Amino acid sequence: MQRLVPTLRRDGVNPELIPVIRTLLAATKEIAFRVRQGALSGVLGSTLDENIQGETQKQLDVIANQLIKDLLLEEPQVRAIASEEEDTVVAGNPKGAYTVAFDPLDGSSNIDINGQIGTIFTIYPARDDVPADSEAQFQQPGHQQVCAGYVLYGPSTILVMTTGGPTRGYTLDATHGSYLLTQAQLSVPLNTQEFALNMANQRFWSAPFQRYVQDLLLGETGPRAKRFNMRWNAAMVGDVHRVLTRGGIFMYPSDNRNPRQPAKLRLLYEANPMAMLTENAGGKAWSENQRILNIQPDSLHQRVAVILGSANEVDVCMSYLLE
């Protein structure tokens, strides 16, 4: 099996980018070990603190964030980092070529129940026209990402990543500590009969989106004339991994629970990297009225609606929303 770095070199990845990726993934190997140890390593439970999102931090949230942050800030090619757990941009080497944003532990509500969790990350070229610690470093549309990926901590530790070409899958060889190429190219089927959605929010959705979901639930007796199954992990990283490996549509639409915050998922370090992975695997990724990768960010922790997955099903969903 091919190791990670030779694969990156074969893909023509910029030599300055490779050490950034390696440094980031070194942190995920340590996180994977802590996750496997669970209660034995004292990482379960919550802290008394909240992050910038107003969410109670889990102990492993804090540990994962610190591991990734510390390693990246030692990497000379990293000019700045942004994290779900950090209020502001953290400056690195002012001469670094790249900026890195990440959700250190997606699905952290699953930690204490031994459910699916993961790390989502994205890498952008650094901007020379703004200071290293400026939010403007990260105010770039998603199509300017040079690398996007996630690590899923499950029965095996899996890395899914793209550097602009195919979306590839790697598996961590725990014996030697290396990520090995196990899926040369993930391909999302055009059609699907599975959807991932938190149905508990149904009463808060727009009328067009509710009609779309209702037609899914009607199955063979409705206008779709086929049966759909629902899957929901309460972790974007797990639900999107299913979509990338066997098809489906993942949806986290806007809702009216809180008019000041109609969307849930963060554009920079959740929606954009997952959109790039999905598109490079042949799927589509939209935010109700536009392609996710075309959105011009206006704030560091900006939230957007997300609809991604099998291309034909995303088109059907969008036809309801844009009618």
Curated annotation (Swiss-Prot):
Q: Which reaction does it catalyse?
A: beta-D-fructose 1,6-bisphosphate + H2O = beta-D-fructose 6-phosphate + phosphate
NCBIfam families (alphabetical): PRK09293.1-3
Required co-factor(s) are: Mg(2+)
Indicate whether Cell wall biogenesis/degradation appears among the record's keywords: no
Instruction: Please give one Gene Ontology molecular function term for this protein.
Output: magnesium ion binding
This protein's gene is called fbp
Instruction: Tell me where on the tree of life, at the top rank, the source sits.
Output: Bacteria
Q: Which GO biological-process labels does this protein carry?
A: fructose 1,6-bisphosphate metabolic process; fructose 6-phosphate metabolic process; fructose metabolic process; gluconeogenesis; sucrose biosynthetic process
**Quaternary structure and partners:** Homotetramer.
PANTHER family, sorted: FRUCTOSE-1,6-BISPHOSPHATASE-RELATED, SEDOHEPTULOSE-1,7-BISPHOSPHATASE, CHLOROPLASTIC
What GO CC terms are in its UniProt record?
Answer: cytosol
Pfam families documented for this protein: FBPase, FBPase_C
Question: Which cellular compartments is it found in?
Answer: Cytoplasm
List the EC numbers from the record.
Answer: 3.1.3.11
Annotated residues that bind substrate are located at D106, G107, S108, S109, N198, K264
In terms of one coarse class, where is the protein primarily found?
A: cytoplasm
Can you say what this protein is called? Fructose-1,6-bisphosphatase class 1
